[in-house]
Amino acid sequence: IYSLDSNGNVNVWLDDSGFANGLSIDSNNNIWIAHHCGRVSHTTPSGENNIVTSTYNGKKLNSPNDIAIRKDGSIWFTDPMYGIALEGFGCEMRDEEQPVRGIYQIKNGEVTLKTGSVEIPNGIAFSNDEKFLYVANSADGVVYRFEVDGEELINKRPWVKIESGMKPHPMFGYIADGMQVDKNGNVYVSGGHEGFAIFSPDGKQLELIQPDAGSSESPMAGFVSNLAIGGPNNDQLMVSVGNQLVIYDIK
């Protein structure tokens, strides 16, 4: 895991990340990490790493992918199968032990399955008022929206899909990957080789942006996998594009 400071300096923050994927920072500046090979951990500001969970109901998790944190401090994560089902993620190939590819909550040290109704759950994000939870389904490229009723998810419905006219990725199909919500409630959805799309809170696609893939000949060149919002005023969008980080100003 790398860090990027305000002066543009890039440093190794965690040398052996255990095949980390999605990251999120809680109110105590702990960095929560979803690990492809089947666990969720957090690292304290002092650098101490703690495995929080690797099982549910006595069975191994599949391949935790992305994380969202509610204002109450609870951790929500998706658990598809990528790390244990596809070569190249660094994990040992194994069968899925969980009966569903779930969306889980960690609260007060307890892990709870909230839903297993999304075929391949990937990116995850709450609306600013936390009335809704958005979950990207990489099986069909659709972002689903759940209503949040206390601790439960209800009224799932297909919300948006990136409209680009591009052909599906040969391995992953139509991708909906990592997501972020800005201060205006707009939802940013990464879409693999389709770039990333910006949707208004009412689900209208405002823009589709396809970053420059650079000179790399890798099959992942130009592949947008995740996003983060940061900067001094939370007015910058950081986008992971293949092996590059591209930064946009949010207007």
Describe these PLM feature segments.
Residues 145-153, 203, 249-251:
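Short loop/turn segments immediately following beta-strands, especially the blade-tip
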Residues 1-2, 39-41, 101-104, 142-144, ...:
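A short loop-to-beta-strand structural motif that recurs across blades of beta-propeller domains
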